[in-house]
């Protein structure tokens, strides 16, 4: 890393620790400590069982409907709590949700690009996140709120139930246009057995 890049990486690292560290919820990973020792940055966090939700986004490996609904409700509750603490995650996606199948417990992780919404550091014009899961206002670089996290959670729900994303494109520009302007494919055309 160049000096400037290294500083930016460190700032993101410690921002994640500070942001997640102020949140105390059973479905948000707990951060116990963060620091730097001998030029090595560290975060001491809760040990999590399980793995992320990415394997369950494949059409041949979907979780049962009841499991998905219960899990999404828990993640929504965790996000509602974060939003009451003025924290918007900004990158909700299956890779950032750890899941313990034995206890049906999801944990929201990776607050690295989260923003404290009452902070002066919240800016418009900056696009951060994973495009397939981003809200139209986030793609446009507008100031975002908790509703953007809920849009991303809805995209994740769609993918966990159907094995496909609601918006796809052959290029980044086409994907962004579709998210901003098109309606998603009706999930019942993909999974007519859903209630």
Language-model regions: role of each:
Residues 1-185, 189:
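Conserved ATP-binding/catalytic core of the eukaryotic-like protein kinase fold
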